[in-house]
UniProtKB/Swiss-Prot annotation:
Organism, scientific name: Bos taurus
Protein name (Swiss-Prot/TrEMBL): Dolichol phosphate-mannose biosynthesis regulatory protein
Gene designation per UniProt: DPM2
InterPro entries in the record: DPM2 (IPR009914)
Transmembrane residue ranges: 11-31, 49-69
Cysteine disulfide partners in this protein: none
Length: 84
């Protein structure tokens, strides 16, 4: 069973994800339909970043997954050599 701390951390992560999803959805889907002179545009980055930020995040995710897999494989290989 999850402890109180786990539940609070989980709730925080869900809330953060919801905020990011809402912001990104408004930025990418709704903002192009609003007049470019409207005051709401100052709260969002330029549209070029709408592609660049997720692309960079995806690359970082793949990089960290690759590093983790490489680390685990090398560690298992070293453990196998020690037992022989």
């Amino acid at each position: 069973m999850a402890t109180g701390t786990d539940q609070v951390v989980g709730l925080g992560l869900v809330a953060l994800s919801l905020i990011i999803f809402t912001y990104y959805t408004a930025w990418v889907i709704l903002l192009p339909f609003i007049d470019s002179q409207h005051v709401i545009h100052k709260y969002f980055l330029p549209r070029a970043y709408a592609i660049a930020i997720p692309l960079a995040a995806g690359h970082l995710l793949l990089l960290f997954v690759g590093i983790f897999i490489t680390y685990v494989m090398l560690k298992n290989q070293n453990d196998t050599k020690k037992t022989q």
